[in-house]
Amino acid sequence: MANKGNKKRRQFSLEEKMKVVGAVDSGKRKGDVAKEFGITPSTLSTFLKDRTKFEEKVREASVGPQRKRMRSALYDDIDKAVFAWFQEIHAKNILVTGSVIRKKALNLANMLGYDNFQASVGWLNRFRDRHGIALKAVCREDSDRLMNGLGIDKINEWHAGEIIKLIADYSPDDIFNADETGVFFQLLPQHTLAAKGDHCRGGKKAKQRLTALFCCNASGTEKMRPLIVGRSASPHCLKNIHSLPCDYRANQWAWMTRDLFNEWLMQVDARMKRAERRILLLIDNCSAHNMLPHLERIQVGYLPSNCTAVLQPLNLGIIHTMKVLYQSHLLKQILLKLNSSEDQEEVDIKQAIDMIAAAWWSVKPSTVVKCWQKAGIVPMEFAECDTESAASEPDIAIEKLWHTVAIATCVPNEVNFQDFVTADDDLIISQDTDIIQDMVAGENTSEAGSEDEGEVSLPEQPKVTITEAISSVQKLRQFLSTCVDIPDAIFGQLNGIDEYLMKRVTQTLIDSKITDFLQTK
C-alpha cells in the first residue's frame, strides 16, 4: 500500500507568504485564500500568526524575498552588521567583491568583540544566499575606476545630467547644502604641528574636539542654525544656560551619527512645513547620511561618491572661511589674555560654541555664492551680489594678528596662519559606529560622555541679573559715544538689545504687580 505520508511538503518564500497575508487583508475569505494558494487552513493560520515576523524581515530587508527558510546566521549580529554596511555601499552604486565583503566582516566582527570569527568563503556563500546577493566579478577597468574616483568625465556628466534635473523645480533660495566638519576647539597656535593630520579616533585629543554641522542655500540669503556635537551631554559650562546660538548634542565620540542627523533633518522638515516651503538638500553619502527618515518638505539629493572635494559648496571655501573667522576670534582672545595679568585659560565648550556660531553668521553672502558657483551647481546668472574671492577673508589684519600672537607664544617659524586654520581638516566626523550601535544589544554606544569629562575646570560664572544686563548695555553705549566713526548698524544692534531687555523687565514687573493685586483680593 502506498504511504500517503510521503507527500512532499511545499515550502513558501517570504514573498509568497506576504502575498497570502495580503490576500486576506484585501477582504477575501480565508477559505478562498487557502484554496487559491493550495494551502491548508492551519498553514494559513500560521502565516497570519507570523505576519509580524515576515513584515519585520521585509522592512529590514535581512532576508532575500525568494528565500524560503529564515534560519538566522550563527553570528547573527555580525551578519546584520555586514548586511547594513552592504546596503549603504549598494545605495552609493559602489561595486564590491567577495573579498571586500569578507574583509569588512572581519573588521565589524572585531568591533563587536568577536575574536574567533572567520570570514571564510563558505561564510560568504551562506551570507549571499541568506540575503539574495549576486556578486559579479569586477574587471580591472572597474577596479581602477573605483580606486581612482569618478574622474573628470563623471563629474562633467553629473553637471550636465542629474544635477540639472534635481534643481529644475527649485530657486537658488530653496537649494541647500549641508556638511560636517571637525573642530579642535582648544587648539593653541604653538600646538599646530602636533594636531595637523590627526584623524582623532579617540584618546586625549578626542576630549578637545567638536563636530559642527552647517547648512546654507545657493543664493547666500539663508544660513541655518549650526548643530554642534560634543562629548559631554551636560558640561559644567552650560549649567543654567537655556539659550545657545546653535543646537548642541553629545555622544562619546563627538561624531555625527545617523540618529543625530535624522533628528536635525526632521526639525528642518517641520520648519519648512510651517513655512509652506519645499527645498532641495544636497549632501554627501557618509554613513551618518544613509537610512533617512520620511520627509515631507525636503528632497534629498546625494553628491557623487569621492567628488565632494570639487562638488560640495561647503567644502569649497565656506567652511574654511568659517574656520578662519573662528581662529581669528580665538587669536583675539589669546592676545587679550597676553596683554592682561590674567592666566592663559583654555577655551571651554560654551566659549567655543559662541565663537563658532559668531564665525558662521559672519561668513558673507558673497563668499557663499562664490563657492556654489565654483561647484557648478547653480548657473552664474543666479548670483546677484558681489562675488568677491572667498580667499579674501583672511585679510591683512588677521595676518598681523597671527604674527603678533605667534611671536608671543613661540610658534615655530615654519607654521603659518593657514596651517593653524587647517590643522583639524582631517578629523573624522562619522564612522561605522552607527552600524555597530544597532547590533549591540543592551549597550548604547552613542551614549554621551560623563558630565565634565575632558572639560576645562573653570570657576563657575555668577548668574547675571536682568538689571545688571541693562546696566552693561548702558555702559557699552556710553563707551561707544566716546569713539569715532562708529557705524550706525552698531547703534541699531545695541538699540535692539536694549529694547529686548526692557521688554522683558517691564513684562516681569507687570506680571508681579498683577499677582500681588490678585493675592490681596
UniProtKB/Swiss-Prot annotation:
Residues 170-372 form the DDE-1 domain. SUPFAM superfamilies: Homeodomain-like. Keywords: DNA-binding, Nucleus. Residues 3-54 form the HTH psq-type domain. InterPro entries: CenT-Element_Derived, DDE_SF_endonuclease_dom, Homeodomain-like_sf, HTH_CenpB_DNA-bd_dom, HTH_Psq. GO terms for molecular function: DNA binding. Residues 66-137 form the HTH CENPB-type domain. It is found in: Nucleus. Residues 30-50, 99-130 bind DNA. SMART domains: CENPB (SM00674). The keyword Phosphoprotein does not apply. Coiled coil: none annotated. GO terms for cellular component: nucleus. Belongs to the tigger transposable element derived protein family. This is Tigger transposable element-derived protein 6. It comes from Homo sapiens.
